[in-house]
Amino acid sequence: MKKFIIAKFALILSVFFLFSCATLDKLNSFSTSMNKKSEESALQKNKDSDKWDIALLDTARNVDYLSTLEKDVILEMNKARSNPSLYAELYISPRIKKFDGKIYNNSIMTNEGIAVVNDCVAYMKKAKPLSLLNPAKGLSLAAQEHSSTQGETDQTGHTGVDGSSPFTRIEKYGTFRTAGENIAYGAKSGRDIVVDLLIDDGVPGRGHRKNIMNKEFASSGVGYSKKHKVYGSVCVITYAGSYADK
């Protein structure tokens, strides 16, 4: 018997951000995040690669069903999971200097300002290293299905244009014990997507951060589309524990 628990749902709008967060227990959780600022590809601009064992962390680089950016997303999540403190030091802490009140980088009105960045840094510095996420074709197909169909519309959120949920999409391609989904709108690099979800501005439960740092998740899939009618792009990230492709 499947057990579903609906937890707190939050929808917060500001100039450049849209966040929604909810949880389901099968055991399951999923969350969304959007940020329009972006960086270059993590691989194209990774001057600190000497600090990471890229060959170990880049678990998706040789698969043939993900784009370069989609592979970058998995690499960045594995960096964050393998050494949370170092990830915070290199990629999250530097954002602190770019705040003026609640305005980030002279252009983005945030919900919480510098406080949420400090909160994220503190969390990451206390977090224990986690096992790496491995790519899964079925999870990626589920993510790509949602990103491609939603990208052709102005819709946001986890409900598919056909009414599907993250879990029905994942079940279409595989079996799992736990599963989750994150969505980012407007971002154009793997690192930008992952850092924004970890910071989780405006979401009291930090559900997006928890998905990335969930010790139960061992597999991940990514779907990225440049065609969203409102935000320009949409990136869907799926997660699962005890997952197997059908």
What do these predicted regions represent?
Residues 1-10:
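Bacterial N-terminal signal peptides that target proteins for export
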Residues 63-173, 209, 215, 219:
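Short, well-ordered surface patches within globular domains
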Residues 30-71:
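N-terminal low-complexity, Pro/Thr/Ser-rich intrinsically disordered segments
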Residues 140-245:
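A well-ordered secondary-structure block
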